[in-house]
């Protein structure tokens, strides 16, 4: 096993460990919320029960998820990374193709989509939380798109690419963000062909 030997190695090792711990905590909260909401419904579960089951405090819970519905669905926060924003705004390429890249680097699809779909089917009260998450993701992307083109073009292009996100989530397994961008471009292309068929 590699032992850290330099200050840089120690910092990188610490950051890696810290990031793994965050992912483990997030995953524990999600698993607990998913199990409890599946068994008892959204109204039948409290944040405190989720926290007790996951072994975290309510303060920790709210550092990871804004609500018990989002925790049960495993919906991550949607923020545009500065590097993706700068690449999109600085590009002179095709708007929709560039938006596919921006969305792929901004919107993180839930890891366990199969269980998420099962939860939504079993507990329809979860649908509004999912729709709200999608609307927030769309608004986040739209705000950046509107910095590059007029608002009408930004809205139409963003709506098209977000529809491709939904379709892509139904079709494919996980992959890298670059693979997601390629899938989004393929789905958008298919939508265009269907629209003119």
Briefly describe each language-model feature range.
Residues 1-9, 174-197:
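C-terminal peripheral helix-coil segments that are non-catalytic and often amphipathic
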Residues 1-40, 44-53:
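Basic, helix-initiating cap at the start of DNA-binding domains
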Residues 16, 41-42, 56, 62-72:
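HTH DNA-binding helix-turn interface
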Residues 38, 46-47, 76-84:
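Short, basic, alpha-helical segments at the C-terminal edge of helix-turn-helix-like DNA-binding modules
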Residues 78-82, 111-139:
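Short secondary-structure transition hinges
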Residues 82-116:
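Hydrophobic alpha-helical connector segments
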Residues 124-159, 167:
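Amphipathic alpha-helical packing segments from all-alpha helical-bundle domains
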Residues 147-189:
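Hydrophobic/aromatic-rich alpha-helical bundle segments in the mid-to-C-terminal region
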